[in-house]
Structure formats: structure tokens, C-alpha cells
Amino acid sequence: MFGLQNRSGSCWVNAALQAIFRFPDVQERYSSNTFEAGNVIDECLMKMWNSKGTVGLHEFHEAVRTDTMPAGLNVGDSHELLNYLCDKLPFLDELCRFKIAHSMECVHCKAKTTTRDSVIEFTLDSVDGRNVPITTCITKTVQPYNIDEWECEKCKKRGGIRQQLIGSFPEYMMFHLPLPNTTVDYSSILILNGKKYGLLSVVCYNGAHWWTYGRNMPPGSSWFVLDDTHVVEHGPKQFPVSAAMRVLIYYRLDE
């Protein structure tokens, strides 16, 4: 584990990078000096990994900087940067992307339509309360719910049931938690449709500062707080739970 320099409020950049540097596939890729020719972001990440953060960070800021992501100039959003990196790094997108479906069924004539899409994260619905299990948040997000004002194109009557479903399960499952009124009780091991996932990294935000909790695989390895240049090791069972968790990334474990 290594730290990253904070340049003019770039904690959000560091938090996102530390999250993906925990991916075993990312570690293997960059340890073998592999990167896509002509992809500056990919090359910068490879340099950062192999130099333990001493080379490549400034060039990375220059490569990803936009009006909404002021890397190296001001505070931005780690969650937004993670999405951006998946867009710019095809190998990362492939590791994280999965299928979802949205269905709408008329409560009167039972006509049903389904739209399908692919995404790189699953945004969880808000569940008010403290210490809400992440499994409860997932269940609520995929439960069907009524939309009384929806009008059926077939029978022209109002009232429908909408539902979101997960259609495939990627190597890395990223959950986004826009839950200001919820303290999520994470699970270190998560079973999704028979697939076993281990918690790998967690991106946190307290309203002013971003940082990451992370560990290497296999499960049972020590957790680390990765906060800019500050790297603090905790035991494997001493994950420092925080109400500031915003992105949880799970790694699919092969049986």
C-alpha cells in the first residue's frame, strides 16, 4: 500500500485511484507494465502503480481535468471520477459493466414493457434509519413499486408497477450510496444470485474530504485507511465502519 500526494484539494482523485488500485486485475495489469498504447490515463496509472505514487500523478491530473472535474486545482467528486475512468479505460469498463432491466406493468390490462441497459454501478434507494444492512438497501431497490399516475399505452388507464432488476453479475460490483439519511451496515461477504462477492474497497466522503478504505485479496487480508499520504493498517476484522461511505466495491470470488 502507498499514499498519494494531495494537490490543491485532490483528495477526491486519490480516493478514486486507491479504490481501483485494490482491484487484483488492475494490480496484475500494471505490475506487468501493460497499458493501452496512446491511452494517457492508462499509462499514468501504470506509472503510479509501479512508482508507488511518486510518478504519473501530475500527468494524470492534466489528462482527466474538465470543468466539472478540476483535478489538481480544486475539490471534485470521486464517484464521478470512477465513472469517468470506466468510460476512458475499456478494460476497467469490462470488469465493472453489467446488465440491468426496467419493467413496467399495467395494473389493469397487465400489458408489460421491459427496457434493458448496461451500467457500471448500481445506485441504491434510500432507506431511512441507522445501521441499515446493505442487503436491505439492495432488496428495496429491486422491489416492484406502484406509479399511480403512469398511463398505459394499451388500455389508457392509469396505474402501473415498475421494477428494476440486475441481469448479470460483473467481476467488480460497484454500489453507489447517495443516502444522506442512512447509515449503511456493510457486509464483508455478499451473495448475489448465488454469486459470492468480497468487499474490496470503500470510498468515503464527509462533506469536505474524500478518502478510501481498502484491502488486497484474498478475503481475510488487513484493511487499510488510505487518506492521501496517510496509510494506516487495521486488522482483517477491524474495518473502520463510517457513516460517510458513498461507494462500495465488491470483488466476485471464484469458488
Predicted features, each with a name:
Residues M1-L89, S103, I249-Y250:
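USP/UBP deubiquitinase core
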Residues S10-W12, K99, S168, Y205:
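Short, surface-exposed loop/turn motifs at beta-strand boundaries within globular domains
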Residues K47, E94-R97, T135-T136, S187:
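Polar/charged alpha-helical tracts
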Residues I20, N33-F35, A111-K112, R116-E255:
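Exposed substrate/partner-binding surface patches
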Residues N83, F91-D93, L199-V202:
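Intrinsically disordered, low-complexity segments enriched in polar/charged residues with Gly/Pro
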Residues G72, F91-C96, G160-Q163:
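Short helix-to-loop capping/linker segments positioned immediately adjacent to catalytic or ligand/cofactor-binding
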Residues L92-S103, T139-E149:
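Short, flexible, mixed-charge glycine/proline-rich loop motifs
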